[in-house]
């Protein structure tokens, strides 16, 4: 097995486990609360379909926000309540509107992620639950890249597809993913990437409580060791999942 295949295997396992954990937490929140759910970065509504399969989630409990108009149209064609909006701006919902808000692989794409999290706290009901999945900038792999004079693979990313490709150490993302960092509204460019400790601290500053974090993918260690290492050192894992209650 070559190094690229090895790291791709690590990445695929990391994302599978991280998304699995996040979805489990969303399902738990929805099972214990009758409130509505807000999907931030809803796309075509794929998460509704997942939650509907798991929980038979009613359509009238689901609301999504998505900035890309064609994806909004596709979601609405499925009968979903998905609104076109910019998560960098104020959320157009009243205070305490939702029992659960989630943002999976969204925070790192925002120019104003702190403002977004403040808005999430505002629109959550008392006892409401936030679930976040986002990459961690504070990893051993990132430290090695910086010491080698490179930029973090987790971002922030420069606005040059050619430069990113030139600097890429291992290609681990889906081959079908098209580079788009040079357009005005990129989907895949990372702008602000938190560390585990800083994100947890900011959630606490906002007034969230019962904040629980999990890390996934402690590179470059092999997959068989990951479950143990992730429990020992979640602070330096590639992906992090946070669950917090208002």
Feature-to-residue mapping (PLM):
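Conserved N-terminal segment of class I S-adenosyl-L-methionine
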Residues: 1-94, 100-104, 192, 215-226, ...
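Ser/Thr-centric signal marking residues that sit
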Residues: 63, 123, 134
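Secondary-structure boundary/capping motif
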Residues: 71-74, 78, 102, 122-123, ...
């Amino acid at each position: 097995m070559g190094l690229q295949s090895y790291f791709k295997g690590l990445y695929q396992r990391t994302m599978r486990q991280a998304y699995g954990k996040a979805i489990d937490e969303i399902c738990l929140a929805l099972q214990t609360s009758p409130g509505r759910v807000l999907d931030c970065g809803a796309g075509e509504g794929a998460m509704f379909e997942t939650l509907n399969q798991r929980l038979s989630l009613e359509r009238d409990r689901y609301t999504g926000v998505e900035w890309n108009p064609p994806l909004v149209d596709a979601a609405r064609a499925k009968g979903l309540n998905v609104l076109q909006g910019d998560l960098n701006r104020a959320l157009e919902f009243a205070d305490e509107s939702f029992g659960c808000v989630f943002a999976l692989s969204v925070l790192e794409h925002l120019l104003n992620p702190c403002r977004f999290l403040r808005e999430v706290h505002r629109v959550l009901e008392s006892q409401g639950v936030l679930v976040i999945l986002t990459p961690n900038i504070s990893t051993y792999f990132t430290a090695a890249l910086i010491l080698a004079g490179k930029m973090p693979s987790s971002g922030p990313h420069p606005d040059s597809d050619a430069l990113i490709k030139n600097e890429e150490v291992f290609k681990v993302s889906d081959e079908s993913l098209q580079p788009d960092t040079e357009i005005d509204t990129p989907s895949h460019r990372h702008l602000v990437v938190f560390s585990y400790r800083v994100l947890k601290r900011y959630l606490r500053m906002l007034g969230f409580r019962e904040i629980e974090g999990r890390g996934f993918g402690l590179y470059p260690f092999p997959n068989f060791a990951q479950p143990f290492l992730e429990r020992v050192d979640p602070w330096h894992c590639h992906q992090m999942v946070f669950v917090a209650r208002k």
